């Protein structure tokens, strides 16, 4: 009997130690995934729901066991001044990224297909379309996440800490004659074999030999073909021009015009006053002076979205969207709750076949190199 009791005690201790080890996480998160072009290996999947994207430096993304949320380690993100590694929206600009993506695919998602399906998805940059995390076009969903902004955070930083993106397909193209059409996968692959794509612009593929006779290919002149590539986030929470802001973007054009950079400025735009071009609308749904934004505490955002419904090739809006945002936190040991966006009708989304996916972290834009550090945690999403 004593042996049985001792055995049960040992088992209990092992279970408790295992549970504690699962809760106690700290240090660098080392793996990165290009969700558009690669599947995620098991070791790269974080807490069974994320993969990391962006710059891979030891400090860029870490578990933070000292700053916990609901008893679990949070995610600490950091970009230093020299960490902008991407081309910016405008010529000559740069931007930086260290984020967690809720959408990704694994090899299991391709098991029922022949190998060519994955190989083609890599070329199409649609690997993540086969996996998890993308909601349906025109659907309704609820999202929750929490952010911790330290009082040391610079008031001149320009960063997006949470964003929703569309999931476009490169099979939607414009021909050199200006015809907009959707290619079959085989038709797109025929273009892929003889062209190099830089963002949405196709260039002739030019053969080049090095001194050893090895053949490589470089981009020649633009040849008039354009492919769908996406655009601004459909919804973004961030800081810019001395403000915390929430911005919704809409693009009703079937093939996005990348030259149209219609984009509301948090500093100058009025709240809920849309800023529009022919096809695009950008709206500051909420803004708050940065000095008033709560620091050194966890802030939870509960977000309800009815995504706008679009008319595909007709370039029309069938039904506007709706946005609702609650902001809760604790100040001086007292719970605070603010209904900062109250069931507002709004244009929000993209005219694509597929819907949207969530990312949070640091997305430093506007050519900013101001160092930034903050923590995020507590994400969930549900269909409504």
Swiss-Prot record:
Its main location: periplasm. GO terms for molecular function: heparin binding; heparin lyase activity. Pfam families: Polysacc_lyase. Residues 1-21 form the signal peptide. It comes from the Bacteria. It catalyses: Eliminative cleavage of polysaccharides containing (1->4)-linked D-glucuronate or L-iduronate residues and (1->4)-alpha-linked 2-sulfoamino-2-deoxy-6-sulfo-D-glucose residues to give oligosaccharides with terminal 4-deoxy-alpha-D-gluc-4-enuronosyl groups at their non-reducing ends. Induction: By heparin. Transmembrane segments: none annotated. The keyword Lyase applies. InterPro entries: Polysacc_lyase (IPR025975). The keyword Lyase applies. The N-terminus is blocked. The modification Blocked amino end (Gln) is found at residue 22. Its EC number is 4.2.2.7. One of its GO terms (cellular component) is periplasmic space. It is found in: Periplasm. Keywords: Glycoprotein, Heparin-binding, Lyase, Periplasm, Signal. Glycans are attached at residue 39. Gene3D superfamilies: 2.60.120.200, 3.10.540.20. Monomer. Degrades heparin and heparan sulfate. Also implicated in the release of heparin-bound growth factors from the extracellular matrix. This is Heparin lyase I. It comes from Pedobacter heparinus. The lineage of its organism: Bacteria, Pseudomonadati, Bacteroidota, Sphingobacteriia, Sphingobacteriales.
